[in-house]
Amino acid sequence: VTGVQTCALPICRSSTQEELTTTIIGQVLFIFILVMLFTSYLSLFRKDYFDKPRSITMLYAMITLFPIFVSLMMKHNFFSVYIIPFAMAPIFVRVFMDSRTAFISHVTMILICAAAVKYQYEFIIVQLVAGLVAIYSLRELSKRSQIFITALLVTIASSVVYLALQLMQDNQVFNVDASMYTYFTVNGIFLLLSYPLMYIIEKMFGFTSNVTLFELSNTNKGLLRNLSEIAPGTFQHSITVGNLAAEIANRIRANSLLVRTGALYHDIGKMTNPVFFTENQAGVNPHDQLSDLESAQIIISHVSEGLKMAEKVGLPGIIKDFITTHHGTGITKYFYINYCNAHPTEVIDKSQFQYPGPNPFTREQAILMMADTVEAASRSLNEYTEESISNLVNKLIDGQVADGFFKECPITFRDIALAKQVLIERLKAIYHTRISYPHLNVRQNAGKKTS
């Protein structure tokens, strides 16, 4: 090594060090801007996620873990980064949260990963298309086959987009790197792991997927089977309420599967004292032997008893919320009014007749409260005409609005108006008038032959 070369070595090292430092600073700045933009999106459009620590944790974990995997693979020259199933992240966010957040988080994650990848333009385009296909092909996860179809579509879409990009650059089919299609196939196979991993994430972060809701709505096992045997009247009421609530949810674009499942479980606490509820009584009313205050306490207790049962079998929190909110902080009006009439001079503690609450804080919970109240009250009508049903529905729901039951949930007046419309339509169909068939008189000559 000559003297000139010896002097040049420190200069080369210094130049390389400066380039490396500059690159790192640029990457950190780039990532910081992307994370801030993603946080701004959440604070502007999905502020509710900040009230759910597990949701926020999962979102930031997704946009952090995948870039770490990419950096490690690039640093140690492992397999191609194209075998990493990046589309898995938007699948999880889509299933447990929403489509828009799934796409925004996916874009953020891919752009961060691109900072460590060669041929960034190609990588970004292929992965963005793969993510979009995954999101739109998996709108509602209700069957295992959907994951397989999604993995297949993502593999095909990635392969076609890569081929298109290569043709635009080289104009030669034969110059396309065939090994890339092997990577895309492996990527699709890894994407199938989304299904078992989904269960782990669900338990880890406390989410509830559609698959779990379908399993919980099976009426042939568990609490629902017990409900059908111990309190058959309540069971039928719950099914009817679930159908009404699901119809409303479909009309206002809420989660119909969630509200139907919640409706099936909302009255499970009645199994403790089934005969104290009118739908399970067979002529004898045990409340006749009790004071109004005692009766009110038994009726109110079905909420706390239902919550105990739900916790015992490990029902998800999102279902337990339907149990606690379906009466809100309302009162047992029948027994409260009776007590007031019987004790006109007494200063009455209203809280003794009041449900513990809380009031509904989601649209689905508000839907259940409306459907439950209307269905129960509809059975007390003397006649089922369009006018009587319409008056009942409007009176009950307007009363709930006036009492402030829906102040804590994001339901609109338009949603409530549509809910009324659905309830009136469905109750008219349930209690439609039937034709009275004529009585067939016995004909004396019916069996004789005529000559």
Annotate each PLM feature.
Residues 2-9:
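Short, small-residue-biased leader/transition segments that mark boundaries at the very start
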Residues 11-34, 46-53:
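Cytosolic-side membrane-insertion boundary helix
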Residues 32-33, 188, 192, 365:
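Residue-level signal for the membrane-embedded core of alpha-helical transmembrane segments
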Residues 43-235:
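Generic detector of multi-pass transmembrane helix bundles and their immediately adjacent loops
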Residues 91, 95, 110-114, 131-136, ...:
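Generic, well-ordered alpha-helical scaffold segments in large soluble proteins
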Residues 173-183, 190-205, 209-258, 290-293, ...:
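Long, compositionally biased intrinsically disordered regions
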Residues 222-386, 399-403:
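Divalent metal-dependent catalytic cores for phosphoryl transfer on phosphate-bearing substrates
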